[in-house]
A protein has these predicted regions:
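Long, contiguous binding/interaction regions
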Residues: 1-83
Length: 83
């Protein structure tokens, strides 16, 4: 079976997010002062061949832990669906 996986990687709460701060300041400078608490992350989409949804999720968690996310400074969320 093939599964489409959406991975959302975000900086851990409480850690400095320089990109988020830069975007927040730029938004304020452009007149969007109501925007606050901006955090910048990234989205990754991939297809995984696996025998089941739990197997696909486990494999992608391994990918995240080893490459796609920094486990010290980032958290990630997965959404798994049949392709």
């Amino acid at each position: 079976m093939s599964f489409r996986v959406h991975v959302r990687v975000m900086p851990r709460g409480g850690l400095l997010d320089p990109q988020g701060q830069a975007v927040e300041h730029a938004l304020a400078a452009l007149g969007f002062a109501e925007a606050g608490g901006v955090r910048v992350g990234r989205a990754i989409e991939l297809e995984v061949a696996a025998g089941s949804r739990p197997e696909a999720e486990a494999r992608v968690r391994q990918m995240c832990d080893k490459l796609l996310a920094n486990p010290v400074t980032e958290d990630y969320l997965l959404e798994v669906e049949e392709a």
